[in-house]
């Protein structure tokens, strides 16, 4: 289990419709909440008021939401909607009916709108595993460090950057690598279909150029 300090326990049940009732969202997204989610509990609040930790410059609180699912998966659109509606950094604990669970977190930055809004940059999740196998690093000097440790722990190998690099730079580097991977896949598919030898050679040179950036 996550073994979060008892002082952080909040334990408030949140009605599913709270996340979309006043928003202009499609009936399909509403159906995701109805059909894929059984129960949402705001389980913990990680903050200087609930833990022995200093304030951060960019992170004031981390909210933990325990979501019990009706089936095996939760569509990412539901998580994104919840993440965007809550003006704090969020850690999701998703639990399947069989008791297996995973953690999900999005690296998010304050939007330049002045209304406490956030912009989601990149989302990460652990593999599905037994609940007692889920652990979080809670040793940090301040809330910024705690948040960074959680994101890095959840992301694991999906974050292609050394720990010495800032989290912001690490996320941007990972996004750039994923963009290059998509471009390479498209170019390789085009080269397989291309009949013209000169165009094949041109595509091959572009593939080599992008591979050099990986």
Question: Where are the language model's segments positioned?
Answer:
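Non-transmembrane amphipathic alpha-helical segments
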Residues: 173, 177-194, 210
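Charged, long alpha-helical assembly modules
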Residues: 208-214
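N-terminal, leucine/charged-rich tether regions that mediate assembly and partner docking
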Residues: 1-102
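Short, charged, amphipathic alpha-helical segments
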Residues: 197-208
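Extended assembly-interface/linker segments at domain junctions
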Residues: 76-165
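Short, charge/polar-rich alpha-helical segments
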Residues: 161-175
């Amino acid at each position: 289990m996550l073994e979060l300090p008892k002082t952080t326990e909040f334990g408030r049940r949140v009605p599913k419709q709270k996340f979309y009732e006043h928003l202009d969202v499609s009936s399909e997204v509403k159906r995701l909440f109805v059909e894929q989610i059984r129960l949402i509990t705001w389980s913990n609040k990680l903050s200087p008021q609930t833990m022995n930790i200093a304030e951060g410059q960019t992170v004031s609180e981390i909210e933990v939401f325990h979501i019990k699912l009706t089936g095996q998966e939760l569509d990412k659109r539901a998580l994104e909607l919840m993440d965007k509606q809550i003006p704090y950094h969020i850690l999701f604990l998703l639990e399947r009916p069989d008791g297996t669970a995973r953690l999900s977190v999005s690296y998010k930055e304050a939007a330049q709108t002045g209304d406490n809004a956030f912009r989601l940059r990149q989302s990460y999740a652990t593999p599905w595993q037994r609940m007692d196998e889920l652990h979080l690093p809670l040793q940090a000097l301040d809330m910024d460090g705690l948040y960074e440790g959680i994101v890095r722990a959840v992301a694991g190998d999906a974050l292609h950057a050394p720990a010495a690099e800032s989290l912001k730079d690490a996320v941007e580097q990972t996004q750039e690598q994923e963009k290059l991977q998509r471009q390479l896949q498209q170019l390789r598919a085009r080269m397989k279909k291309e009949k013209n030898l000169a165009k094949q050679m041109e595509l091959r040179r572009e593939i080599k150029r992008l591979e050099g950036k990986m």
